[in-house]
Structure formats: C-alpha cells, structure tokens
C-alpha cells in the first residue's frame, strides 16, 4: 500500500520511498545510478564521470526538484538513493512520466512497478485523468513494466538521441486514470 506525505514531499511503499534529493545523497545516487552506463543506456542523460561531477549534479538536482514533480528513489531497507522518477502535467489532467531509473542492482525486485504505480496514484490525487509512459523500443524491461501496470501501447515516435545523434523509436503507453485505480490509497 502506498502512502503520500505531501507536507514532507515524499511517497512510500513497503520497499521504496520517493523523496526530494538532499546533498548527502550524492554518493549513493552516483554509485548506484549516475555512474552506471547500463542505466543511462535508454535515458537522455550522460554518465557522471567522477565524484566532483556527482557533487555538482546533486546540487542541480536539488534545485530542479524544488519546482518539479521529481524525486529520488530510496530503498527503504538501506536508505540509499537507488534511482529517480518524476511526472509532469502536459495538459490539464494529462500527465507524462519524465523518467524512471534504477541502478542495475535494484532491477528485478519489483521496485519499478512500485514506482510506476505510485506515480500514477500521485497523478490521480491531482485529478489526473490520463497517464502516459514512454520507453525506447529496445528497452524490453521498460515495456514489460508498462504492460504489467495496465498501460497499453498508444503510438510510437521517431526521435534523435542528443548524445549520439542516432535515431530511435520511442514507444508511448497510456492508461486512463479516472476509471481504474492502481492499488494504492492516498493518505
């Protein structure tokens, strides 16, 4: 069961917490996510090369999260920052996820499903009616996550990777939120 604590800027499930970044998170998010090429592969960000870069990046992340619906993902048991996630309202009542990333050691534990369900429930709490999720066509784990959470394929768009200049297919998945709950209560 998920819980929202808006006054504290966080959401929780049994295994994870979505919370706003703090400076001291730089080391764990760097080690678990930002330094990992396998995590960046299907994303639109570049790997952070060193600890100094991670310290600078966490400062930018903190500033960004102050004005956006974006969070770090913390593993409840260890308290470590193991990923990030976010959403944005693109039109009234229409939300898009803005990226979900987990460090490779944390994939396959059900955390992605918990994150995606929390994001959808958060959007419902904001009177969201449609939720969109996107993934690169080759990212089979991300596609499986979308389908496992009840999203359906909507359409594809050809995009250009700003890092490499190569084109790729971005698959867009959709779920109507007003008619179907996602298994969590807002508190």
Across the structure, where does each feature detected by a protein language model lie?
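Acyl-donor (CoA/ACP) binding surface of acyl/acetyltransferases
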Residues: 1-28, 32-36, 74-187
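Hydrophobic residues in alpha-helical segments
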Residues: 33, 43, 62-65
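Conserved GNAT-fold acetyl-CoA-binding loop/helix
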Residues: 38-60
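Secondary-structure boundary/capping positions in well-ordered alpha/beta enzyme cores
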Residues: 46, 68, 126-130
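A short helix-loop-beta-strand connector motif used in the catalytic cores of GNAT acetyltransferases and
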Residues: 59-72
């Amino acid at each position: 069961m998920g819980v929202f604590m808006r006054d504290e800027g966080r959401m929780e499930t049994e295994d994870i917490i979505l919370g706003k970044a703090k400076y001291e998170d730089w080391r764990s998010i760097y080690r678990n996510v930002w330094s990992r090429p396998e995590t960046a592969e299907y994303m639109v960000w570049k790997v952070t090369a060193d600890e100094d870069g991670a310290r600078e990046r966490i400062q930018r992340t903190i500033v960004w999260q102050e004005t956006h619906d974006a969070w770090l993902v913390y593993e409840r048991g260890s308290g470590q920052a193991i990923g990030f996630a976010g959403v944005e309202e693109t039109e009234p009542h229409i939300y898009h996820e803005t990226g979900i990333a987990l460090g490779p050691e944390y994939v396959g534990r059900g955390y992605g499903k918990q994150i995606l369900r929390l994001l959808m429930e958060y959007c419902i709490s904001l009177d969201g009616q449609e939720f969109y999720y996107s993934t690169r066509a080759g990212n089979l784990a991300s596609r499986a996550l979308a389908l496992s959470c009840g999203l359906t394929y909507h359409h594809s768009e050809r995009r250009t990777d700003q890092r490499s200049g190569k084109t790729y297919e971005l698959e867009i998945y959709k779920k109507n939120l007003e008619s179907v709950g996602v298994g969590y209560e807002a508190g």
